[in-house]
């Protein structure tokens, strides 16, 4: 075995789950460990495309309540236990998913990020909602000039986070990111799946239709019945906000589907740029089938 731990990451709908299934069938002694921040929630297996899991092989999927504000720090604690358990039982841990913050924190160590007050979060959220994309970007740059070279104008989530941090602390988010805890492990190999965009966009569109057919609307109904705060992570999973609007009568089902597909495609586009620049040691694979054929262990 070349590396004790394998990381398989990549953009959404790139075939990571199917690849892990194929590798498990090929090698057998594998523990597949989730690093998708939304696939941890047990109430939304369909809309987050969780694998049809067998507990002995799939770990950290669908085990957290949607009521919880699960964090990367908690995930790292759970991950460490699962990786060690796999190694102790002569299994190969495969960490897989597309949450960039989770992957980055595993590889580089967890950043000591500050707590952000609810008041600051609310104010930034209102600004993001009420300003145009260009106006919001200009505002963030006026507070933190370092953003210009590091965050693109279309990445509203990271721009909001940067504005929250500098508003709360007076320091740029990039200073906080440099202050990291040591990584949990260093004996890993990372592969990044970046297929052709057209193929991914087509899969995103068809996959969301299948989610609707398989019961995604009922999942979101259950979330609404739980009276969850709209800022909880589970309520922000791709497709959930759009279906919520449909269930409240604000848009039609066709509109909800189209908007969710568009938003997910935009997310995939941002992921392309992010993954290409973040992990220089990663081996980039165009197609998941290529990796299945490789002798990666």
From Swiss-Prot:
Extract the ranges annotated as region (Interaction with substrate tRNA): 36-39
The record's annotation in SUPFAM superfamilies points to: P-loop containing nucleoside triphosphate hydrolases
What are the disulfide bonds?
none
Binding of ATP occurs at 10-17
Q: What class of enzyme is it?
A: transferase
Which prosthetic group or cofactor does it need? Mg(2+)
Picking any one GO biological process from the record gives: tRNA modification
Query: Site Interaction with substrate tRNA: which residues?
Result: 99, 121
Highest rank taxon of the organism: Bacteria
Give the reaction(s) catalysed: adenosine(37) in tRNA + dimethylallyl diphosphate = N(6)-dimethylallyladenosine(37) in tRNA + diphosphate
Q: Which Gene3D superfamilies match?
A: 1.10.20.140, P-loop containing nucleotide triphosphate hydrolases
Under Gene Ontology molecular function, one entry of this record is: ATP binding
Q: Which Pfam families match?
A: IPPT
Question: Its Enzyme Commission number?
Answer: 2.5.1.75
Q: Which UniProt keywords apply?
A: ATP-binding, Magnesium, Nucleotide-binding, Transferase, tRNA processing
- Where is substrate annotated to bind? 12-17
Query: Does the record's keyword annotation contain Repeat?
Result: no
InterPro entries given in the database record: Dimethylallyltransferase (IPR039657), IPT (IPR018022), P-loop_NTPase (IPR027417)
Family annotation (PANTHER family)? TRNA DIMETHYLALLYLTRANSFERASE (PTHR11088:SF60)
**Similarity comment text for this entry:** Belongs to the IPP transferase family.
Complexes and interactors: Monomer.
Job of this protein: Catalyzes the transfer of a dimethylallyl group onto the adenine at position 37 in tRNAs that read codons beginning with uridine, leading to the formation of N6-(dimethylallyl)adenosine (i(6)A).
Q: What is this protein called?
A: tRNA dimethylallyltransferase
